[in-house]
Amino acid sequence: METQRASLCLGRWSLWLLLLALVVPSASAQALSYREAVLRAVDRLNEQSSEANLYRLLELDQPPKADEDPGTPKPVSFTVKETVCPRPTRQPPELCDFKENGRVKQCVGTVTLDQIKDPLDITCNEVQGVRGGGLCYCRRRFCVCVGRG
């Protein structure tokens, strides 16, 4: 009788633990990868933009050193380029081709890898053209300019 009662109690605890595991998502399921967090920032940029076309990730700088806390803001630097897709279409930017001679923006700021917390602090500035119709790409304090003339 005592063994049967202990078995029933153990069964209930197992059921409770299983239900708890299903209801409470794990921390790893809530954490985004560095790239996913940046893509989310690009989506936010497109949502808040008043420009005609969507922007798509062109280049992503290396992620910062590993930090175990997904809620801690992480520095980010990336480049986006204008696509051929009009903003009102709501098409995923990853499916859009880059626009020939489209605008290029360098973006810096911070993101978190936590899906629940959503603080993004990103500033994007258009990469300025140079004489002859070329472009300058600046990364931190180093710029490379490619001109046509």
From Swiss-Prot:
Q: List the disulfide bonds.
A: 85-96, 107-124, 136-145, 138-143
Stretches of the chain forming a coiled coil according to its record: none
Q: What is its main location?
A: secreted
Q: Propeptide residues, per UniProt?
A: 30-130
Q: What is this protein called?
A: Protegrin-3
Could you tell me what this protein does? Microbicidal activity. Active against E.coli, Listeria monocytogenes and C.albicans, in vitro.
Q: Mind naming one GO cellular-component term on file for this protein?
A: extracellular space
Q: Which UniProt keywords apply?
A: Amidation, Antibiotic, Antimicrobial, Disulfide bond, Secreted, Signal
Segments for region (Disordered): 61-80
Which subcellular locations apply to this protein?
Answer: Secreted
Q: What is the lineage of its organism?
A: Eukaryota, Metazoa, Chordata, Craniata, Vertebrata
Q: Which residues carry this modification: Arginine amide?
A: 148
Similarity field: Belongs to the cathelicidin family.
- GO MF entries: lipopolysaccharide binding
